[in-house]
């Protein structure tokens, strides 16, 4: 009853929420929030896109079928202005570009509540996003949260039934975000495993690249099922090394998110891997794609981190060799076939 009373008071005060990022996932999050809130902050770099949204109620680059009620949107390309506006900052900027955006900050993040919707590792620090804000900006872990799937932005745009896990060590904060994202087509649940869920969101992108490479090389569904089975076991070993706590790796935030990213036609990481399997170089595959494949950057950071931790990660090792050491995908998967079971 104490929790419910506290949450009720919290909801009455309606802390302000802002989304940072202009990509497909940021756009989907703004759509979800707009189902419940009368006012949402939205920061992105592009003045052109902001002006287009104001005039046409749509993001011209991502999920352009989604029509926004622009009277609900507080739009800005000034990151400091948006940080000052909001109590909750939902960060959905690709990890490769996050620090460049944060370098623009002149205002303090003290007292702000940060929820990461980024499925990647920050290259400059090799931290997951929550750790990065904690270590580099002194944000206490009680003010850090994670938004994870299984949930593709494209299906949010189509209003297909989707599921989100909202993780925070403070249940009131997790519930506040969960309630404001929930709708008839979005089901939400909360968790206190901020480290495990975020690492799972990072690792599943690497395994999706593996699934894509396998498909590009001509491996069928039978092998894909074995690959995904081995991927979830590898994920469990990796996460146990970085953060020991009791967790059910078969829950949707871990296994569910892995499966949708590994199998879906909407998965940019699987698409990236598929191109590698078909013979594209890493550089040409990245140039061909209009969206960032977070798994490319995550592979290097996860591989380096595991050199210290020593978990058994043959899939990550193979993908690292292909992406960063120029090893032949066909030969590397012939090796992988003999390792996994």
Language-model features and meaning:
Residues 7, 211-215, 240-341:
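NAD(P)-dependent Rossmann-like dehydrogenase/reductase catalytic/cofactor-binding core
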Residues 7-66, 72-77:
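NAD(P)+-binding Rossmann beta1-loop-alpha1 motif at the extreme N-terminus of oxidoreductases
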Residues 70, 74, 79-159, 177-179:
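Rossmann-like NAD(P)(H) cofactor-binding subdomain of soluble oxidoreductases
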Residues 121-220:
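Rossmann-fold dinucleotide-binding core
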Residues 159-164, 195-240, 251-271:
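Active-site-proximal catalytic alpha-helix in oxidoreductases
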């Amino acid at each position: 009853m104490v929790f419910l009373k506290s949450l009720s008071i919290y909801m009455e005060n309606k802390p302000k929420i802002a989304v940072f990022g202009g990509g497909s996932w940021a756009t989907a999050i703004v759509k979800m929030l707009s189902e419940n809130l009368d006012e949402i902050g939205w920061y992105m770099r592009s003045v052109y896109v902001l002006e287009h949204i104001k005039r046409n109620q749509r993001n011209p680059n991502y999920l352009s079928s989604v029509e926004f009620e622009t009277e609900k949107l507080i739009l800005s390309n000034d990151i400091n202005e948006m940080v000052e506006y909001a109590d909750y900052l939902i960060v959905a900027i690709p990890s490769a570009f996050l620090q460049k955006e944060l370098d623009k900050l002149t205002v303090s993040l003290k007292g702000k509540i940060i929820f990461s919707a980024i499925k990647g590792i920050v290259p400059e620090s090799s931290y997951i996003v929550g750790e990065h804000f904690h270590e580099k900006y002194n944000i206490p872990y009680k003010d850090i949260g994670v938004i994870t799937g299984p949930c593709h932005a494209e299906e949010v745009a189509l209003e297909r039934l989707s599921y989100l896990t909202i993780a925070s060590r403070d249940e009131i904060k997790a519930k506040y975000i969960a309630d404001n994202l929930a709708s008839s087509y979005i089901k939400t649940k909360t968790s206190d495993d901020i480290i495990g869920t975020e690492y799972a969101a990072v690792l599943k992108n690497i395994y999706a690249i593996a699934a894509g490479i396998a498909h590009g090389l001509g491996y069928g569904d039978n092998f894909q099922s074995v690959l995904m089975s081995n991927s979830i076991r590898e994920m469990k070993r990796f996460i146990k090394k970085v953060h020991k706590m009791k967790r059910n790796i078969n829950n949707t935030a871990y296994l569910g998110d892995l499966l949708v990213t590994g199998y879906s036609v909407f998965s940019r990481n699987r698409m990236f891997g598929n191109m590698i399997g078909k013979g594209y170089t890493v550089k040409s595959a990245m140039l061909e794609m209009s969206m960032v494949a977070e798994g490319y950057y995550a592979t290097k950071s996860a591989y380096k981190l595991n050199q210290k931790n020593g978990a058994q990660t043959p899939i990550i090792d193979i993908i690292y060799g292909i992406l960063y050491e120029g090893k032949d995908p066909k030969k590397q998967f012939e090796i992988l076939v003999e390792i996994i079971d």
